[in-house]
Regions:
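Hydrophobic micro-packing sites on short alpha-helices
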Residues: 56-60, 70-71
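Short C-terminal boundary/hinge segments that cap the last helix of small helical domains
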Residues: 64-76
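Short, basic-rich loop-to-helix N-cap that marks the start of a DNA-contacting helix
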Residues: 48-58
Length: 76
């Protein structure tokens, strides 16, 4: 199970990075929009942190997506 969780974290982080770049946002801008720390955004994008449902909602909202849409982009 830990390997699967790590894979999901990486997939989600890559999706967040892809969406951020598609929206032409810096990590700092995304952190501001999602009301999260810059460090936390970096850790998510590197696949080092599992996000909570609240964080998922905040990130999706910053991209003007639903949480389900953001998860779908991560192929989760």
């Amino acid at each position: 199970m830990p390997d699967r969780a790590a894979k999901l974290q990486r997939q989600f982080g890559q999706a967040v990075r892809t969406e951020r770049k598609a929206h032409q946002l810096t990590q700092q801008q995304l952190a501001f929009e999602a009301q999260l720390s810059l460090t936390y955004i970096g850790e998510i994008e590197r696949g080092q942190r599992m996000v909570s449902l609240d964080t998922l909602q905040r990130l999706a909202g910053a991209f003007k997506l639903t949480a389900a849409d953001l998860l779908a982009k991560a192929k989760i």
